[in-house]
From Swiss-Prot:
SUPFAM superfamilies: MFS general substrate transporter. One of its GO terms (cellular component) is plasma membrane. This is Multidrug resistance protein MdtL. The chain crosses the membrane at residues 4-24, 42-62, 69-89, 93-113, 131-151, 158-178, 212-232, 247-267, 271-291, 295-315, 328-350, 355-377. It comes from Salmonella arizonae (strain ATCC BAA-731 / CDC346-86 / RSK2980).
Length: 395
């Protein structure tokens, strides 16, 4: 079991590392490529576009050909794309590398969730996803620090050499440590009609959890996107104060994430999901009424506490009905989360909504819609029939 957890963690880790590690070198990258920082900020959107593109096909391939081949190919693509970014001499080549990085990270991300679905029951899966969420919260804090230390002695290309090395490590783990978890009884070229019917993506429960997780990811990405403007322009924080504040928010997320597995032993998953949305609603109201920086910061901390309480549980429930199509289900969730959150941020920017109101709007909207879905769409008894765990992994 440890091998599956180790491999799943490293597969997921490529996604946040690809976002956060290079940011500290952005000014030097822009100078060397004769591009403005504003032009290179689109690299974030290009990276997410690459992830969404990979998710369109990675899940289905993983269900038909296996988790291991997709993980290996994804890691190789991430590694090669990182090298391409390091050798870029102009902006378009750099953005091409970022897109391919997203393709590699997206493929690995989908496989990681499929592996967890294959090997863990719902309660253990929810606990592990909460722990993984806590660990990945460390990356946005540590990655820029590591990047800064690297750039004290080496050029910005070393940031991408480091990411390439991460891709090599993930590839080696996938090649020699990871065992295939795809159900042995799943035919490689076709699925029976009865299996498709039993595990259809078009069912109320899955769609409700897809909506909840998409809205929750939209909240956290809106927070990340709006935080520089909100903290440094509206609240007039210095860069140092901003860094400290973001480290504190990451710390809150980590503490709550590591506490959630223990809470799952005391409370029902539905209770934790309602608590999560209650914290989002409280945060939205707090931010809308805040007149001081202290109250605003309290509202931001509530966001970082609310997300890890319910996200892992909701993801676990969403994957629960899919014994044979975990890859497709994982892809669908990933695409919805990436595209849904990007669409909200884009629409808010087009409409000229301020950073604070953008955050308040998604907090209140997410909490109300999610609470209604949690209360009105409960897991069906038939879902438990499909909660099959495929521990008999093959080499």
């Amino acid at each position: 079991m440890k091998r599956f957890l180790l491999c799943s963690f490293t597969l997921i880790l490529l996604y946040p590392a690809g976002i956060d590690m290079y940011l500290v070198g952005l000014p030097r990258i822009a100078a060397d490529l004769n591009a403005s920082e504003a032009q290179l900020h689109i690299a974030f959107s290009v990276y997410l576009a690459g992830m969404a593109t990979a998710m369109l096909f990675a899940g289905k391939i993983a269900d038909r050909s296996g988790r291991k081949p997709v993980a290996i190919v994804g890691a190789i693509v991430f590694m090669m794309a990182s090298l391409l970014c390091s050798q870029a001499t102009e902006g378009s080549l750099f953005l091409s590398g970022r897109f391919l990085q997203g393709v590699g990270a997206g493929s690995c991300y989908v496989v990681a969730f499929a592996i967890l679905r294959d090997t863990l029951d719902e309660r253990r899966r929810a606990k592990v996803l909460s722990l993984l969420n806590g660990i990945t919260c460390i990356v946005p804090v540590l990655a820029p620090v590591l990047g800064h230390l690297i750039m004290l002695r080496f050029p910005w290309q070393s940031l991408f050499y480091t990411m390439s090395a991460m891709g090599i490590i993930v590839c080696l783990l996938s090649l020699f440590i990871l065992r295939e978890t795809r159900p042995a009884r799943l035919a490689p070229r076709d699925l029976s009609r009865s299996s498709h019917a039993a595990e259809s993506l078009i069912n109320r429960f899955f769609l409700s959890r897809l909506a909840i997780t998409t809205l929750s990811v939209s909240v956290i990405l809106t927070f990340v996107n709006a935080s520089p403007v909100l903290l440094m322009e509206v609240m007039e924080f210095s860069r140092g104060d901003y860094a400290i504040t973001m480290a504190l928010t990451a710390g809150v997320s980590m503490v709550v994430s590591f506490s959630t597995p223990f809470a799952l032993g005391l409370f029902k998953p539905r209770t934790l999901m309602l608590v999560s949305q209650g914290l989002f609603l409280t945060a939205g109201v707090t931010l809308s009424l805040a007149h001081t920086n202290t109250v605003t910061l309290f509202g931001l901390m509530l966001i970082c506490a609310g997300f890890p309480v319910g996200f892992g549980v909701a993801m676990s429930q969403a994957l629960g009905p899919f014994s044979l199509r975990a890859g497709v289900a994982s892809s669908t969730l990933g695409i919805a989360q990436v595209c849904g959150s990007s669409l909200w941020i884009w629409l808010a920017a087009i409409l000229g909504i301020s950073a604070l109101n953008m955050l308040i709007g998604i907090l209140i909207g997410c909490s109300i819609v999610s609470m209604l879905l949690i209360l009105s769409v409960a897991p069906n008894r038939s879902i438990s029939e499909h909660e099959e765990i495929h521990n008999q992994s093959r080499p």
